[in-house]
Structure formats: C-alpha cells, structure tokens
Amino acid sequence: MKMNKTRLLEKISIQSGVSLDECGTVFKTFEKVLSEELSRKMYRYGGWILLLTALFVSVTVFSQTTGRKGRPMQTIRGIVIDGDSKFPIPYATVKLSEKEGASTITDSLGRFSIPQVPVGRHTVEAAFMGYEPGIFREILVTSAKEIYLEIPLKESVNELNEVVIRARTNKEEAMNKMATTGARMLSVEEASRYAGGFDDPARLVSAFAGVAPSVSSNGISIHGNAPHLLQWRLEDVEIPNPNHFADIATLGGGILSSLSSQVLGNSDFFTGAFPAEYGNAVSGVFDMKLRNGNNQKNENTIQVGIMGIDVASEGPLSKKHKASYIFNYRYSTTGLLNLEGGTMDYQDLNLKLNFPTQKAGTFSVWGTSLIDKFTSDFEKNTEKWDYWGDRSESRDKQYMAAGGVSHRYFFNNDASLKTTIAATYSQLDGGATLFNHSMESTPYMDLDSKYTNLIFTTTFNRKFSNRFTNKTGFTYTNMFYKMDLSIAPYEAEPLEIVSQGKGNTSLISAYNSSSVGLTERWTLNAGIYGQLLTLNNKWSVEPRVGLKWQATPKTTFALAYGMYSRMEKMDVYFVKTKSTGNQSVNKDLDFTKAQHIMLSFGYKISDRMNLKIEPYIQFLHDVPVMADSSYSVLNRSDFYVEDALVNKGRGRNVGIDITFERFLEKGLYYMISGSWFDSRYRGGDGVWYNTKFNRNYVINGLIGKEWMLGRNKQNILSVNLKLTLQGGDRYSPIDLEATMNHPDKEVQYDETKAFSKQYSPMLIGNYTVSYRINKRKVSHEFAVKGLNFTGAKEHYGHEYNVKTGKIDVSDNSTILTNVSYKLEF
C-alpha cells in the first residue's frame, strides 16, 4: 500500500498553521519512535495509524475551523480568596503581567474573567490593599480549555502604612499555609510536563528532594522510610493505596496512580514535620485534591496511546446555579507493552460534582475507583523450568473505591465549617498454584481480603485577625474488615492460616492547629493531634510546632518539630501461628511512633530562581519487630506478615535535602535536587542495621525547553529530560547452608548482617517530547514519553537455579515508552 506522505503533510500544515518543514521534522521524530516501539508489537504501520487518526479527526470533525486566521484566543477565569479563611476577596485587581491592558477587577464574590488571552504561557498577578500580591507564573493557556485559577492572598500582619510588598508565587510554598518545612505544592501541569511523570502524581514527586524513585513501582520512599509509611489523602480523607496493582510488588506503591492528572487539582506533598491536621502517618503525607469542572462550557479530552485510552469531560450541570461536573475514565491492557511475566488489565474512574448555593454553602460529590486484573504467564514446557517460580501460576484481582459528600459553609468572611461523609473500599483476591513435572497442581497461596471504612470528618476554620488563624478538626473512622490468608509452608504441603479475622473497629482522631503572625517577619505554627484505636485501646497525643523567620525579602529560616504515629495494616493485628492456634498474636500492637526535627533555609536568588536547604533528623520508636531477630516493619515491602511482633524496635533517619530550581521562563526550566541520608534501624535482637531503603544518596537533574512554532507562534514543541543517580538496592548476604537445607531450596539470608550489602548505583533516565497544535476551540497533542531509557536494573532478591545448582540474582531492567495522541475540544 503506497501513501503520499508529502500530500498528507501538506494537509496537516494547512490545518495546523504549521510550516511544511516543521511538520516534516515533527513527523519524522514521531515516526522513528513509533516504528521502533511498535514494530516489535507487529504494528508495522503504527506511525501511519496514529497520523491518519489525528488527520481524520482534524479534517472531518473540525474542518469548520479552517480559514480562521490569527493566534487562537482563550479565557482565564478564577477566584481570589483569603489564604487563611478561604473567603472570596471582592474588588481585587487581577492582570496579566506581560500584556498591557489585560486586567480586571473581581466581582463581589471574588470572581474574575480575562477574555481574549493568546495561547501560550502567561503570568497572572492578583493584588488587594493590605495583602501581599499573589503570582501564578507561566500558566499554560491552550485553545481548547479555559483556565481556572484559585489565587490565595496572604494578609499582611502589619498596619497598612507599614506593609512591605513581597509577592508570593504559586510554587514557592505549600497550599496549606500552616506548613513550616518539608512541604511542596505540585501542580497538574508539572505532572504532565516533567519527564518521568507519566501523568502520575506519585512518579512526579520522585523529582523532589528527599524521595528515592523506583522504575517498576511508583512507591514513595521518603528519607529512607518504607513506602507504606506514607499516608494518601483525597479531599481531606485518608484513602487506601490509590495505585494500580497496589501493594503487590511494593507495599505502599503500585505501577501507576489511578488518580489521573485530568481531574486532579493542585496538591501538597509533605516529606516531614507536617502540621497538626495530618495524623496516622510517619514518613510523609500526599494531600491530593480534585478540581471542579468548568461551570460555563463543556470541555472534553480523548487520549489514545500504547498504555490505553483515556476519556475526560467537564462542564456545567446548571449554568444558573454554577453547578459543574468533571469525570475521567481510563482503560488499559499492558499486553500491548509485551511485558514479561504476565498480562495486566486495569481501568479507573474519577469524578467530582460541585453544587454551590446562595445561602446553604457548597456541596460536592466526589469519588475515585479502580479495577485491576493480573494473570501470570505459565511455562508448560517443563524442560524450560529453571527456577521454583517457573512452576507457579498466579492470579490477582483488585478493587479500590473511595467517595464522599462534602459540604463547606461560611458563617461570615472569617469562619467556615467543612464536613465530609465518606466511604472507602479495597479488596484483594489472589492465589498461586504450583505444578510438578507431571503437571499436577497444588495450591501454594490463597488470599481474600475486604476492607470498608466509613468516615465522618469535620473541620472548623476561623481567622480571628490578620495575625491569628485556627483550625480544629475531628475524624471518626469505622473500619470493617474481613481477611483470610493461607500459605503452604513448603511445596505440596497443606495451606496454613497466616492471618484471619472478621469484624469492625474504630480509629478516632482530633486536632487543633494555629498560625500566629508574631511580627511581619516571624510566624509561629503550633498544634496538637491525638488518636485512639478502639481495637486495643492504644492512643497517642502528638504536639507539633514550627517557627518561620523571614530574615530578608529573599531569605527565610524555619524550624519544625513534631511527634507522629501510624497504625499497622489491619492484617498484621490478626496474624495467627501454629503455637497460638486461633489466637491473634499481634492484636495488642501499639502504634509505630516517630519524632521529626527539620531545619529549613530558603534563598530567593531571583524572581524565577530559588535555593532551599533542609537538614533533618527523625527518631522512630515503638516499632513492631520480631523478638530476637533483625526483622522490622520499617523494611516491610511484602503484602503480608506471618510472625508475632513486639513494639521494641527503633529507627533513625538523618540527612539533608537540597533543591536548586529555576521556574519556567522564556520556555526554559531546570531543577537540581539532592539528598544525602543515612537510614538505620534496631531490630528485636538489639542490633542496629541499615534499612532496606537506605540508598545513602539521590541526585536528580531536570531540564526542559519549549518552543513556540507555527505561523502565529501558537503551537508548542516541548522537550524534557530527567536523570537520577542514586545508591543501589540493599540486600542481606546469602546463608548458603540454610538455603541448601531448605526443602524447596528457597534462598535464605544471613539476618545477622541484614542489608549490609549494596548493589552498584543506578542511573535512571526519563524523557518527554510533545508537540501541541492549537486551533480555534480545539487542541491536538502528540507525545512520546520514555521511562528508564538508560536501562537501569532493579534487584528483587535471589533464586536457586535447579539446572545449575547455583543461586542467581533476580533482577530486571524495566523500560517503558508510551506514544500517545490527545485531542481536546
């Protein structure tokens, strides 16, 4: 079949307003990547298929846009609010800093609209008398979607005639104004732009100082802590792990977040010493928000790529009452990726409905859910069996959902009450079967777990003055559980119960947190948090305090301290052993507890360039460990525990995080972040060891460049690169004698030297290349995203080779490439 590529490119050039040469350059780039990535999947004409699909949609559906000349325009809308009370600020000035005359005044409800904004990058400034100006820099404006901004302004603590004008940008600090150190706001736009982000917020934060990334998993290890010690929050509610195939490869992680960047709003990420409103977390908190849909017009997105299909839509439910909806659905089968080990199918759905009223406050209905299915490959040719795992066949089905109804009511312009009633659900149904050389099967593992949480949470926020703001909150979580895990101790032996339980219990928590402006330069954040687990009546009271000093308009110093605690996964409390029969051996376990101390130094080199240095130390105590053993939950990565534990372990993490960042300006941004740390723990044997996640160092380098192309400079070519150098995986020396004496030759380790060995450092490279074509009311984007193009290997342990009689390293180099086409209209 012959195709006239020149003629096709001419049509695209006419439709997009891009010169023929530029179209040819972009096409060759995508054609090369497509042919390399898709040819091995037998898609010979993959490049042509994607090109023709884009061309067909562009020509047949949006042909009416041809003939329109000039740079496409868009509208920037939003609201200006008080950063402490969240109440709208009427009659504030909002303008585009680089466009003369593009300014407006907010109405009586704090709303603003700036029409006729050319596509491209723009900086939005908001100002009001008595407040420090707020700046949102380099906002990406496209032709297909309106931009909606929520701009918080901080009221000055001084009298009007003493106000020092100090503009605050949207990326310099967390959205939560009571955060003192260890906090970072991340935007949805960054998630789609940063190399290696894969539109996944969990992978995005791996670029930040203090976080050690993985390739095969998006588990978040902060300062050497295990990923399961992080808390996931959505709309102010703790939710189950929101990742696809959660907790299978790494407890606390998965392969990809179910929360799409299509529906996420700006969120906060904490790496330590977080404020009093956050509890039941030891290492950090990922506080995510869903954005409201456009309440003025319908907007839609369709994305097709190797990883699957993605459909999103938003718009008004009632223009009269300003109600809106937004949803996103995604389906993928990684059979397209030709992954070794099995086939993964997953899908997810996210939504939010927003209903503002004139007198009764604002109601919202929100939710997220996922369905995952995994089937392992099984080699039926017994001559190809090299390892014990080659004889096993496994299955896995997972379900997760979280949703709720939230209500916010303003009593006046300085006090509000937000209440949420929510429910979460998670289910894991899995099993594994072993085959002998006669192809006779015996069950090796059987798992069926269901967890349902009913949650009531309420927060009262009051701004007493420009110096003093207080938040008080209460949360009641009723937890229903049903779990049944059985594992065969050895091959061909009957299954034995590992954990089993059915019932319900409650976690009750409350907090009080205040922010006090002592002077214009000194701010004190202090509070207290407490929680009670009714399962065993264990409780904890935790003070938090932070002090921030604005030494100069460019220099800040901060110090924060806090106590923290976290309950274990529910299955841990119901572990059963042979000696105890039906008695649960861990039911009286106390919380894992920690104390964080963090210093912070920030220097604003210029309006676009920041330096931040944060040394820290964390002490962990009452850590569940196994008596007379090196085992500790601080190293836990498996989805189950099968031993009796006691709260006699300790841990210590000490290090320093450094970030040097240049925000996007004139199409260029870059960031260098580094972390040097030492993470150690004391087991039940009283000996101190390296933790499993003690890589010692992580260095990230990010850089990206954008070019405006096309006749009217309305199209955007973006190239982004990320390189990560980090210490290698840790492991324990092999106990060869114990391994050879094991009935199944399962590799045994010398636990007296736990995690004393380390593999070579890892160099992980990621890239993102995209080209966006902006037409009137429609936008096309072609993107190629690569993960681990450097081929860094991750190590998963060791396996006994039945053919050679030797023990081999189990490792893998996961390399992913996603080629996609996105249509916004």
Provide a role label for each language-model segment.
Residues 65-69, 73, 79-85, 92-97, ...:
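Short, acidic, small-residue-rich periplasmic hinge/interaction motif at the N-terminus
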Residues 99-111:
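Short, acidic Ser/Thr/Gly-rich low-complexity loop/linker segments typical of extracellular
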Residues 115, 239-269:
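Short acidic/polar hinge/loop motifs at secondary-structure boundaries
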Residues 238, 243, 380-381, 427, ...:
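Surface-exposed extracellular loop regions of Gram-negative outer-membrane beta-barrel proteins
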Residues 255-299, 310:
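A beta-strand signature from Gram-negative outer-membrane beta-barrel systems
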Residues 449, 453-457, 498-511, 586, ...:
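Outer membrane beta-barrel strand-and-loop segments of large Gram-negative receptors
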Residues 617-619, 640, 644-727:
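Gram-negative outer-membrane beta-barrel transporters
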Residues 724-746, 760-766, 771-825:
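C-terminal beta-signal and adjacent terminal beta-strands/loops
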